[in-house]
Each structure stands twice: as structure tokens, then as C-alpha cells.
């Protein structure tokens, strides 16, 4: 079982079925050294689960102690599928049974669907896989991912946790309740620290006039982060505003844009994203309020991309055609002057004479490496 479920609580009375009437063998509490084969066991099982969940599946995580390299654990693979609609998971119970799982409903945690695979040998019960299904946006996803990633980022904490589990397994080899109770205080303290740490999200806003290359640079930054393994989301805000009609008085569609951003970020966060790169024009600090509503408590850094007016005009001509060209040329010049006068950026990056990869590298080195949490910054090469 993943560490944050505390214990396998009994289902509510309306979930009782005949399988609960069978006297169960005692569960052996066995904590073993980390096995490098665990990630592969997860990947193999994830492939089987993908075939079951199909279009309902958004992402699938390896969670719990077996997902933390070097951490001693009970040899149980904990898996967290993120789905679009939790209620539709009930229709998949038959397919899960065919994979050898026992459907347990919510099993004491509202909004969850829980399945386990187990067997009995020599009078003892052994679990091999636990599957905890949640709908995208569930706070329980944050709890599981925060706890896992915190232990990955802080090996000293993971070592203390391993020592505690090994001691408890020795004291209570066939008493899972006492084993879980013994972990409870450590888990609560660590979870509190992990969630505070998890909430530290870096949001990098790439601002600048029309034609300066915001989207191209944002894509290059995202490619670099992806290559380094940094979990993040990339969003072009203008694409989220493309809805007609706009709310009267909302000329640029910020209302629908922020509503769409909230949905996209919710899904990205449930997939494990810990950083947001967003391309959009920001003319005032007040325009960032909607972003703060979507990502509360985030560290927001505004990067203004700048270019000389002749270079800007050349770039606009390269990308715009037809009757809209003259408007975009005027708008680019207006925005360039307005953004320079407002000077609300935290970092100014001149783009004249620099290729897109060079600009992206400057942003990563000047902005992201210093501002990202240490475990993510260390991934950047």
C-alpha cells in the first residue's frame, strides 16, 4: 500500500460482499532492501492497466516506497492511475478481475477506486500490487506525488523512513495494524513538509511584443526541460483565448483564457508537473492576478523578450500574410514601446542577433536554474 493511505480501512457497509466474509490469513509485514527491478515491474503492470483504462486514462504514476530509489520497502508495487471520470472506473471492475485484481471500491477514501492483487502461501497473505485510482485534480494525487518526490529529493529523510520501517517490521512481523500505527507520526510530519515543498511551483511568463518569438522560445525552453527530465507544462495563453464571442469588455478573452488555463494546469499538475512555462503578453502586474488564482502561491517570474523595431518588423513580415500584416506591424511596435515603458519584467532578454536556442539557454541559466527547487535545478545540464 502507498504510504499515505495509512492503513487499509474497512469499506462502508454498502460495499460489503461475500469475499469479505472469508477469514483472511494474516499478512506478513516484510520490508526488504530496495530492488532495482521494481521500476520495471511497474512499467510492465502499467502497460496492462493502460489496456484496461484506455481513453479514461490521463497518466499513470508509480508511487509509494518502491518508487523511491534506494528506499527499503514492502515489495508491493503501488500504482496511481489518473482518470478523467472516477465514476466510470466502476465499469472496469470486470476487466480488473481478469488481470487478477480484487475491486474494493473507495475502500475508506472518498473519491478513490482501489484494487489489490494478493495471494496466500504457507498460511500467510501477500500483496503484490495496489492500484489507487483518482480523478484528475484530486488533492490525494498531490499528497502521493509530494510524498514520493520529497523522499526522492531528500535521501536523509528516506533513510530515516527506511530504518523506521525495518524496525517496525521486526517488531510486528504479522501485525499490519501496529506496523502502520508505528509509521503514522513520521508519515504525518513528513507529509506536511512534503506538501509545503510541493506547492513551490515556478511559473515563468515569457512576455514581449507580437513577433518577438515568445512561442518559439517557450517551445525551445520546454524541449530543454523535457530532455533534462524536468516535469513541467508549456502553455501558449493566446491559444486558450480563441473563443468567440468574448465576454463584453474583455477584448482579449482573458476570462475564458484563465478558465481554460485552470483546467489545463489541473491536468498537468495531476501528471506531476512542478513548473509552468507560459507565453503571453503582460502589460501590467495586475494581469498576473488571474495567474495567481490558477497557481496559488507560485513563484512568478516575468521574462520580457525584446528586439529592435526593424528586427521586430522583419520577424512579423516572415510570419504574417494578407490583410492582417499591417495591423500586426502596428501592434508589434505599440507593444514594444508600451512594454519598455512599463518595465514590469523581472528579467530582460535581448533577442537581436540570437538564435532561438541561445535565447532559451539564457532563460534557463539566468532564471530557471536559480529559481527551481534544488532537485529540479540539478537535472539541468
Put a short name on every predicted segment.
Residues 281, 297-317:
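Conserved phosphate-donor/acceptor-positioning beta-strand/loop module used by diverse small-molecule
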Residues 48-90:
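Active-site nucleotide-donor binding segment shared across nucleotidyl transfer reactions
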Residues 214:
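Conserved lysine of the Walker
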Residues 321-365, 369-381:
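Small-molecule kinase domains that catalyze NTP-dependent phosphoryl transfer to phosphate-bearing small molecules
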Residues 2-61, 196:
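Helical scaffold of the NTase/Pol beta-like nucleotidyltransferase catalytic core
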Residues 34-49, 83-118:
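Metal-dependent nucleotidyltransferase catalytic core
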Residues 256-296:
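Glycine-rich phosphate-binding loop used to anchor ATP phosphates in small-molecule kinases
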Residues 219-263:
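Conserved substrate/cofactor phosphate-moiety recognition/catalytic segment
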Amino acid at each position: 500500500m502507498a504510504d499515505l493511505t495509512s492503513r487499509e480501512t474497512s469499506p462502508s457497509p454498502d460495499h460489503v460482499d461475500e469475499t469479505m466474509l472469508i477469514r483472511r490469513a494474516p499478512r506478513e509485514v516484510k520490508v526488504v532492501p530496495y530492488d532495482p527491478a521494481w521500476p520495471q515491474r511497474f512499467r510492465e503492470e502499467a502497460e496492462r492497466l493502460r489496456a484496461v483504462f484506455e481513453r479514461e486514462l490521463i497518466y499513470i504514476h508509480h508511487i509509494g516506497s518502491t518508487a523511491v530509489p534506494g528506499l527499503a520497502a514492502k515489495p508491493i508495487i503501488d500504482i496511481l492511475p489518473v482518470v478523467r471520470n472516477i465514476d466510470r472506473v466502476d465499469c472496469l471492475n470486470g476487466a480488473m478481475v481478469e488481470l487478477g485484481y480484487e475491486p474494493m471500491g473507495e475502500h475508506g477514501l472518498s473519491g478513490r477506486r482501489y484494487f489489490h492483487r494478493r495471494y496466500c502461501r504457507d498460511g500467510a497473505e501477500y500483496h503484490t500490487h495496489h492500484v489507487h485510482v483518482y480523478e484528475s485534480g484530486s488533492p490525494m494525487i498531490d499528497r502521493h506525488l509530494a510524498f514520493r518526490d520529497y523522499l526522492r529529493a531528500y535521501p536523509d529523510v528516506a533513510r530515516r523512513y527506511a530504518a523506521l520501517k525495518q524496525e517496525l517490521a521486526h517488531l510486528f512481523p504479522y501485525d499490519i495494524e501496529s506496523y502502520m500505527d508505528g509509521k503514522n507520526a513520521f508519515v504525518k510530519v513528513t507529509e506536511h513538509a512534503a506538501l509545503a515543498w510541493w506547492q513551490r511551483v515556478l511559473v515563468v511568463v515569457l512576455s514581449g511584443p507580437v513577433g518577438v518569438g515568445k512561442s518559439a522560445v517557450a517551445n525551445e525552453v520546454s524541449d530543454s526541460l523535457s530532455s533534462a527530465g524536468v516535469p513541467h507544462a508549456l502553455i501558449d495563453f493566446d491559444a486558450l483565448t480563441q473563443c468567440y464571442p468574448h465576454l463584453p469588455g474583455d477584448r482579449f478573452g482573458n476570462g475564458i483564457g484563465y478558465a481554460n488555463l485552470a483546467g489545463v494546469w489541473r491536468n498537468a499538475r495531476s501528471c506531476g508537473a512542478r513548473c509552468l512555462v507560459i507565453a503571453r503578453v503582460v502589460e501590467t502586474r495586475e494581469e498576473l492576478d488571474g495567474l495567481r488564482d490558477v497557481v496559488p502561491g507560485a513563484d512568478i517570474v516575468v521574462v520580457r523578450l525584446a528586439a529592435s523595431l526593424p528586427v521586430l518588423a522583419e520577424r512579423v513580415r516572415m510570419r504574417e500574410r494578407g490583410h492582417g500584416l499591417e495591423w500586426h506591424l502596428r501592434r508589434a511596435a505599440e507593444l514594444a514601446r508600451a512594454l519598455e515603458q512599463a518595465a514590469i519584467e523581472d528579467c530582460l532578454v535581448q533577442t537581436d542577433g540570437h538564435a532561438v536556442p541561445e535565447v532559451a539557454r539564457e532563460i534557463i541559466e539566468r532564471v530557471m536554474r536559480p529559481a527551481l527547487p534544488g532537485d529540479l535545478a540539478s537535472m539541468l545540464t
